[in-house]
Swiss-Prot record:
<feature type="binding site">
    <location>
        <position position="152"/>
    </location>
    <ligand>
        <name>Zn(2+)</name>
    </ligand>
</feature>
<feature type="domain" description="Deacetylase sirtuin-type">
    <location>
        <begin position="1"/>
        <end position="247"/>
    </location>
</feature>
<dbReference type="GO" id="GO:0017136">
    <property type="term" value="F:histone deacetylase activity, NAD-dependent"/>
</dbReference>
<comment type="function">
    <text>NAD-dependent protein deacetylase which modulates the activities of several enzymes which are inactive in their acetylated form.</text>
</comment>
<feature type="binding site">
    <location>
        <position position="234"/>
    </location>
    <ligand>
        <name>NAD(+)</name>
    </ligand>
</feature>
<feature type="binding site">
    <location>
        <position position="106"/>
    </location>
    <ligand>
        <name>nicotinamide</name>
    </ligand>
</feature>
<feature type="binding site">
    <location>
        <position position="155"/>
    </location>
    <ligand>
        <name>Zn(2+)</name>
    </ligand>
</feature>
<feature type="binding site">
    <location>
        <position position="106"/>
    </location>
    <ligand>
        <name>NAD(+)</name>
    </ligand>
</feature>
<keyword id="KW-0808">Transferase</keyword>
<keyword id="KW-0963">Cytoplasm</keyword>
<dbReference type="InterPro" id="IPR028628">
    <property type="entry name" value="Sirtuin_class_U"/>
</dbReference>
<feature type="binding site">
    <location>
        <position position="35"/>
    </location>
    <ligand>
        <name>NAD(+)</name>
    </ligand>
</feature>
<dbReference type="Pfam" id="PF02146">
    <property type="entry name" value="SIR2"/>
</dbReference>
<keyword id="KW-0862">Zinc</keyword>
<feature type="binding site">
    <location>
        <position position="23"/>
    </location>
    <ligand>
        <name>NAD(+)</name>
    </ligand>
</feature>
<feature type="binding site">
    <location>
        <position position="216"/>
    </location>
    <ligand>
        <name>NAD(+)</name>
    </ligand>
</feature>
<protein>
    <recommendedName>
        <fullName>NAD-dependent protein deacetylase</fullName>
        <ecNumber>2.3.1.286</ecNumber>
    </recommendedName>
</protein>
Length: 247
């Protein structure tokens, strides 16, 4: 069975596609994922705590300077550019085929590629808010701030990135929005995620159709439920297909 050809036909024939993606979408933009052998959780660093600990709400509260040291070094990739997957998805949205992108990533590369309807389950590095007065700050304010801990230029409060840390709940509006898109989609393409991070991985259970596509370099717990499984680079697969279709 030519899975790539089948995916091409699905994309060609559908105008109600939803994409759900994880860290593997951005690894081709040289942003490391979390759980692979080269991922953030496996590689050695100069920090005294594990990434899981440092990316927790309690660590942010108790060791705010250490949090920002880690965050600025390991979570922000200001020179990263959208890759073939990001551009392909933006084109599919532009021609009216893709209705929403649901992402676990915080890098903002989908928007940089031109995608409009992006649901960021774990937040985004481009949004930062004063914890006291709620003033908005962009990423440059964090990067260019001379202090390790960025402070609000109005009230002096700590400026916290709008990313979901461990021990923090996901935004229920985003979850409900994502569920609605998944439930109503004709084709659900899941890419670059091992589907082991909950509650985000639960989204797949809301899909009611019979055109589930999984594109990931390694197998996932949901492979047997999918109509199409492709263990390959999501950028080369989606990028190639979208180019062939002339979108």
């Amino acid at each position: 069975m030519d899975t790539r050809k089948n995916l091409k036909e699905l994309i060609k024939s559908s105008s109600n596609i939803v994409f759900f993606g994880g860290a593997g979408v951005s690894t081709e933009s040289n942003i490391p994922d979390f759980r692979s052998e080269e991922g953030l959780y496996k590689t050695k660093s100069n920090f005294s705590y594990s990434p899981e600990v440092m990316l927790s709400h309690s660590f942010f509260k108790e060791h705010t300077e250490d949090f920002f040291d880690f965050y600025k070094e390991k979570m922000i990739y200001k020179y990263a550019k959208p890759n073939l997957a990001h551009h392909a998805l933006a084109k599919l949205e532009k021609v009216g085929k893709l209705k929403a992108i649901i992402t676990q990533n915080i890098d903002g590369l989908h928007q940089l590629a031109g995608s409009k309807n992006v649901i960021e389950l774990h937040g985004g590095v481009g949004r930062n808010y004063c914890m006291d007065c709620n003033k908005f700050f962009d990423l440059n304010y964090i990067l260019n701030n001379k202090e390790v801990v960025p402070k609000c230029d109005v009230c002096g409060g700590i400026v916290k990135p709008d990313v979901v840390l461990y021990e923090e709940p996901l935004n229920m509006d985003n979850i409900n929005n994502a569920v609605r898109y998944v439930e109503n989609s004709d084709v659900l393409i899941v890419g670059g995620t091992s589907l082991v991070v909950y509650p985000a991985a639960n989204l797949i259970h809301y899909y009611k159709g019979n055109k589930l596509v999984l594109i990931n370099k390694s197998s996932t717990p949901y492979d047997r439920k999918a109509q199409i499984v492709i263990n390959d680079s999501i950028g080369s697969i989606l990028g190639g297909i979208v180019e062939e279709l002339g979108y």
